Amino acid sequence: MTMDDTKATVLSILADLTGEDVSSNMDVNLFDEGILDSMGSVQLLLELQNQLGIEVPVSEFQRSEWDTPAKIVAKVENLQ
């Protein structure tokens, strides 16, 4: 999977979970803006696992490392 494919998949998951298209602002803080909450985080991790085979235990989820679309894409790319 290319970097563009990964980015598109992550943005699609975020859009499905939040109802928001965040592709135009990859640095928006999803938590501060109320776009994503703790339940959404768990759903995000489950969808990343289902769609991309990325496993991130909830216990290892550091909110500050996953708070923008750009950070999420970078984390996923590092874990692939």
UniProtKB/Swiss-Prot annotation:
One of its GO terms (cellular component) is cytoplasm. Signal peptide: none annotated. It comes from the Bacteria. The keyword Isomerase does not apply. Keywords: Cell wall biogenesis/degradation, Cytoplasm, Phosphopantetheine, Phosphoprotein. Its main location: cytoplasm. Pathway: Cell wall biogenesis; lipoteichoic acid biosynthesis. It is found in: Cytoplasm. One of its GO terms (molecular function) is D-alanyl carrier activity. 4'-phosphopantetheine is transferred from CoA to a specific serine of apo-DCP. Belongs to the DltC family. NCBIfam families: dltC (TIGR01688), PRK05087.1 (NF003464). This is D-alanyl carrier protein 1. It comes from Lactiplantibacillus plantarum (strain ATCC BAA-793 / NCIMB 8826 / WCFS1). The gene is dltC1.
